[in-house]
A protein has these predicted regions:
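Positively charged N-terminal leader segments that act as targeting/secretion signals
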Residues: 1-7
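Metal-cofactor-dependent catalytic cores
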Residues: 8-12, 16-176
Length: 176
């Protein structure tokens, strides 16, 4: 019988097995791990986001972002790196974070499993998914035209439930 090794990380004083089961909940709460690759904000509407590598997130949004303090629940947008990478591999454009106006470019989440109400723990910050997909024609941030961007279905908009600092390289735990 082969011995099975489990690697553990410590996150907010809880042991979380890399296989995705929170050991403190006997498997009742499934958690997925991912990582923030880019933290981006925009200073103006309808422009590409700029990668600033880390940012303060409070209950009004991302400090310094054009949407900060505007109310509403769509305070932070997440986009899957895997889909963005696929887009750039098929286009002649050079890869860059913020190309689609996203706030967080994230790697490692099963985006097909995300539902409204899912939560994401990023260090001290707790996000809750409030909308999946951009919906309808949107302004393509890169060209400033009304078009349907290929990333629209993949956007996940979140509300900030607990404030803190978002950083590149931060591990994200997805809670369903």
């Amino acid at each position: 019988m082969a011995l099975r090794k489990e690697v553990h990380i410590f996150c907010i004083a809880k042991r979380v097995a890399v296989n995705g089961v929170n050991s403190n909940t006997s498997g009742r709460m499934r958690q997925k791990m991912a990582k923030i690759l880019c933290v981006c904000i925009s200073k103006e509407r309808k422009t590409c986001s700029q990668n600033i590598h880390e940012c303060e997130a409070d209950l009004q949004g991302l400090v310094g972002d054009v949407h900060y303090g505007m109310g509403g629940r769509k305070q932070v947008s997440l986009l899957p790196y895997e889909k963005v990478k696929e887009y750039f591999e098929q286009s002649e454009e050079e890869f860059r974070c913020g190309r689609f106006g996203e706030n967080l470019l994230v790697e490692g989440i099963d985006w097909n499993s995300i539902a409204e109400g899912n939560r994401f723990r990023c260090g001290d910050v707790l996000l809750e998914a409030v909308r999946i997909g951009a919906g309808g024609p949107a302004s393509d941030a890169y060209k400033g035209e009304k078009v349907c961007t290929p990333m629209e279905p993949w956007f996940v908009f979140c509300q900030i439930l607990e404030a803190g600092r978002l950083r590149e390289g931060e591990i994200i735990l997805q809670q369903r």
